[in-house]
Amino acid sequence: MLISADSHVVEPHDLWVEALPASLTDQAPRAVQDPSNHHWYFEMPGHARGVDLTLSRTAGISNADVGARLAADPSAWIGARGGHDPHERLRDLWADGVHADVLYPTAGLSLLQLDDASFQAACLRVYNDWLAEFCKTDPDRLLGIALLPLWDIDEGVRELERAKALGLRGGLFWTSPPADRGHSFFTAHYEKLWAAAAALEMPLSIHILAGHRTKNSVAKFGKSIEDTFYFGFESRDEVQRSIVELIAAGVFQRHPKLNIVAAEAGIDYAARLERRIDSTFGRFLSLMETPLTEKPSHYFRNNVWCTYIADPVGLNNLRFTGADHIMWSNDYPHGSATWPRSNESVSQECEEFGIDADTRDKLTWKNVARLYDIDLDVVRDPSPHL
């Protein structure tokens, strides 16, 4: 059995144009087709171009094939429809041996980088309402993660509570805060959110490309070799830095039942991060005030859950990190997805690195089921909506 801890919906092109109040229509995020390559891109008036929505649904299809098919027919639909159609998704997942998946946004990631608090909150409510309807098709197998507005922390807490009532299973907040607005993770700004998430038993997440440090990364991607390579490092470094900040700030010391998922940043950094934060703690932090009563790696292993897609370096280092807080994901329907050969991909990696059956089960379904309280007796069988 496989359960993906990080997959994606691909929002309808006109979701926000149709659902936001008429007074916000001109500002509404939308999909726009580029006449030069016929790809659809997520755009917001007055902002840099966002994610390539065409390539966000092309699991199992090469970029070259996408280009050739669009050149022949610019209006062609290419790729999976499960990003916006829950019934198609359930069929695609079952065919791939995936019994359930945790759903993150595609276009919606960049909404967490908006500076206009009221406009952002309106956009996030639209997304969360749509996602809740999507997941209602099969709530045991489609586990939606809500987007949370954090400029006003009370608004963020209310939205997390609303998400819980809607049947969503967690909340996603900005991966890194704006550097110049007094919202560092070391401040008390977030305390109500940490407490609410722990009390509600709602895991929180940070995801690559959803923070203020990487605000323009997507727009720059592909423009130059420098920006393209930097994109690959910057998006994951942002997640790692925020993990360290949350640990050092004593967030998990104060809220031991809080769970935070580091999504799509991989696990190749995990052993190095553990060693470095413990070394720093042992050598330097004893010379100053610290809220921590345990080694930093204790909080990393007990409160931070890391997802990976295909990560040979990270899997080779499981002997250092353990496997109890690491979760496999297939990234469907994005171009980097293991779909439609997820079982083959997992089996190859496990064989190559000598991963035993119990560890494989932890990585591919036990850990995620434990974190999100997935009913395994239900999801073992095919969805009634197939």
Label the model's feature ranges.
Residues 156-167, 262, 274-275, 282, ...:
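Short, electropositive alpha-helical surface patch
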Residues 3-5, 101-103, 143-146, 171-173, ...:
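Hydrophobic faces of well-ordered beta-strands that scaffold small-molecule active sites
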Residues 1-3, 12-100, 129-137, 158-162, ...:
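Mid-to-C-terminal alpha-helical segments outside catalytic/metal-binding sites
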Residues 65-242, 246-249:
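Active-site gating/metal-coordination segments in enzymes
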Residues 233-242, 247, 284-315:
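Aromatic-anchored helix/helix-loop segment that forms the rim or "lid"
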Residues 165-170, 198-203, 223-225, 255-258, ...:
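Glycine-enriched alpha-helix->loop->beta-strand junction motifs that scaffold or abut catalytic
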Residues 8-9:
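Di-metal (Zn2+ and/or Mg2+/Mn2+) metal-binding site signature of metallo-dependent hydrolases
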Residues 204, 208-212, 247-297:
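Aromatic-lined glycan-binding groove of carbohydrate-active enzymes
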